[in-house]
Every structure is written in structure tokens, then in C-alpha cells.
Amino acid sequence: MYFLPIWFQAVKGVDAEKSGIMSLPNIGSVTVFSMIAAAVTQIEGHYSPWIILSSVLMAIGGGLLTTLKVDSGHAQWLGYQFLSGIGSGFGFQGPVIAVQTVLEMQDIASGVVIVYFAQSLFGALMVSVGQDVLTNELLKNLKIQLPFMDPRVVTDAGASGFRSSVSAADLPKVLLAYNAAVTKVFYIPVALACASLVGALVIEWKSVKGKKAEPEDV
């Protein structure tokens, strides 16, 4: 949800601090529901259902975020990001728990490192891809909405500064262009969530309760 604060700044006209506060439902739900999933997994034993549910909820939440409009109210942007955060939280610790359950004791450390490395690398890569999509879509939309205006007036000013660079008459069209660009970026996590469901459905179904520490050879 790296680009949700950008939507708040550009479309809703808030500053960076306020956009961070408005993004707290997503951050909070990820934290709370990751702990819930981990706790229930330790009690019930199976991690696979949470990973599957995570993919489904992230796809639904991300899909709803693509429907945000300039005039979307609190119910929409609060509810959509909260649902997406629940999905992210349910699957947040799943891969690490799976590695710790499936691998042999001597391979767990390497497996956990690989999981964290892949998550960090892929996350950084997707942010870069999303930024490219945002920039290209914004330029395209501005040319459609305001063909006689230099789009650099908006892009150079940034998400929170363009309002002082455009006229009051042009502002509604700029907001439409920005909204369409940011919501287009949300299709990326939707696609990734749908793709992750394939892996979630075929992941080995094991219980963490069956993992026993093996005595070291003397």
C-alpha cells in the first residue's frame, strides 16, 4: 500500500503527515491480524488456510481500491484498505512458518533468510514498477484531460504541491487524471494476489504441531 498515501495527498489534498495518519487502518490491521493468524496457527496447527485466505482477501481489497474515485468518502477508503490489510496480515508470517515447519532443522535458518530476502527484493522491485506505471499513466491522463497544458507543471510539483501550480478551472481534471493513475497502480497488487493464490493452494499442508526438534548427533 505504498501508493495509498500518494492518493490521499494528490486526490484528497492532505499533507504527508495527514496521509500517513489516514493510512493507519491498513498498517494497524496488518499488525493485529498477523498476530491473530500466528496465535491461532500455534493453537490449531495449520498455516495453509491463512495463506489461502490472505491471497483471497488481498485480491478483493486491492480490487476495491481500484474503484476509488475523487469523491470517495471515508467508508470507501477506510474499509477497502482495512480489508486489504487484513489479507496482508493473515499471510504476513505464513511463509516463514511454512519454512520452519517443512524444512529440516539444519535448513531452517537458510530458508528463513531466503524468504526475507525474496520479500524485500520483490517489494522494492514492485515499488519501482508501480512508480513507472503511476508516472506513465499520469502523463497519459493529463494529455487527455488537458491537452494544451504542459504535464510537467503537475509532475514536477509532486502529489502534494500541484494544487498551487494549476488553475482552479483545471484542478478538477487534474484530480481525475491523478485518481485514474494511482488506481491503475492498484491493479498490480491485485494481479500479484491472484497469482499468489496458485502457490497458496499447492503449498504443503502440514501442522506446526508435528515439528519436533531432532537431537544432535554426538
Stretches found by the model and what they are:
Residues 160-218:
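Transmembrane-helix exit segments and adjacent C-terminal regions of multi-pass membrane proteins
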Residues 18-22, 143-148, 211-217:
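Interhelical loop segments of eukaryotic multi-pass membrane proteins
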Residues 77-154, 184-188, 201:
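Small-residue-rich alpha-helical segments with characteristic i,i+4
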Residues 12, 44-48, 137-142, 146, ...:
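Membrane-interfacial segments
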